[in-house]
A protein has these predicted regions:
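Bacterial N-terminal signal peptides that target proteins for export
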Residues: 2-20
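A structural boundary/capping signal
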Residues: 2, 31-231
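A general, composition-driven signal for non-globular sequence regions
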Residues: 7-11, 29, 118
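Bacterial N-terminal signal peptides
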Residues: 19-29
Length: 231
């Protein structure tokens, strides 16, 4: 059964870092966010060596899903991406990676065919960007699940700047407006550029650059290394 996950609430005194380091990470990470996921024969070979033939085939399926998206409406892209990753089984970071809080890339998720809540949300984020969805419409959102009384992470999609966001969640196959998810209390959200503290279920107050989140910095660098295999 899908579960929320044991995320650690952000300590914003620790998350801030120097402006020079932030600028460097923005330069390194810009290509990832502008272009989305990149696939190559070298990457597929690495997947097979690391995780086996079935994992390689899952990455090919993701590649084909992205390639087919040009003929699909944006709402259709949301539905397909949500369904694609929600079929991956849930497990904790301790069980999967022997760590308290590990953010797995989409390739690692498909490698082990299992994920914690943040892995679902971030994998959906990068896949939708790869399909041409504007990054400004997407926010990876840290919430508290009132049902499970646990920290959780979801992906919010904003049809327009002032619109109520839609929530993509591994706990349910239904994509619902944020106002209907009374079981979730937002804490903060971010995308490739910005970081927001929650004001209500539908909006937040911008407080800086997303690169001030240390896990996000490490995630960007790791994903770039994986996509650069063989180059």
């Amino acid at each position: 059964m899908p579960r929320a996950c044991l995320l650690t609430p952000p300590d914003f005194c620790v998350l801030w870092r120097s402006a020079a380091a932030a600028a460097l990470m923005l330069l390194l990470g810009g290509w990832v966010f502008a272009q989305g996921l990149a696939f190559s024969e070298a990457l597929l070979g690495w997947m097979e060596r690391e995780y086996g033939v079935a994992a390689r085939d899952r990455v090919i399926e993701l590649q084909e899903l992205i390639a087919a998206s040009a003929q699909i409406s944006e709402s259709g892209r949301l539905e397909r991406v949500n369904a694609f990753f929600n079929r991956v089984s849930y497990d904790s970071d301790y069980a999967l990676w022997d760590q308290k809080d590990y953010w797995a890339t989409p390739f690692e998720v498909l490698g082990v065919n299992s994920a914690d809540c943040e892995d679902y949300a971030i994998s959906k984020y990068f896949t939708l960007i790869s399909m041409g969805v504007d990054e400004d419409r997407l926010r990876i959102t840290y919430v508290k699940s009132l049902t499970l009384n646990e920290a959780h992470m979801v992906l919010a999609y904003y049809p327009s700047a002032e619109a109520e966001p839609l929530i993509l969640d591994n706990l349910t196959g239904n994509i619902q407006p944020a106002g209907e998810r009374t079981d979730l209390v937002p804490v903060y959200s971010f995308n490739g550029a910005d970081l927001w503290l929650a004001v209500n279920r539908m909006d937040g107050k911008k407080v800086g650059d997303a690169d001030r989140l240390s896990l996000w910095q490490a995630y960007q660098a790791k994903l770039m290394r994986q996509m650069a295999v063989g180059q």
